[in-house]
Amino acid sequence: MANQKSSLSIPPLASKRFTIIGIILLCTLLQVINSLPGINLNGLGIYPRSLSGLSGIFFAPFLHGGWAHLISNLIPFAILAWLVCQYSVKRFWVVFIFTALVGGLLVWLFGRGNIHVGLSGVLYGLWGFLICYGIMHRSFKAIAISVVVLFLYSGLIWGVLPQRPHVSFESHFFGALAGILIGYYLAKKDKKIS
């Protein structure tokens, strides 16, 4: 008998589900903990131009100001994340990490002097990526996804403008900017390869 190595392989759809559901569960778990009496994890968010607030770049996307804040982010995040995963799960992680780090760093540098938390910076990054990538790459798939995003979420454009004092428009603006940057870069790179 030949010695065959078996490898565990996750079907692509299952890995998309795992990726998106994993982030949703992490955010929900942290909100449950944050809701317990005497616990305030939001202090781990981004506090602009403070050395201790710099670490918030890594924590802010997973923390939320309350259940309404979390829920308002989860549905559009799940849809936009699923659309990015149509390219690949690896592509999703590249966009997620880039928008979280670059958008978060820009919030730390230029944001108002209060704590910034929430998945919406990354959500806007996914949105910016999907639109820019579709425009720049110009494949049928990329354009179709961009059209869906514009149809479903064209109203997000207003979130990059200061409207309410308790909403971090900076996270929205810099997340979208980071998404546009990575969308432009990856579209140009992918066009050279194809």
Q: Residue spans of the language-model regions?
A:
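A detector for small-residue-rich transmembrane helices and their helix-helix packing motifs
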Residues: A2-S194
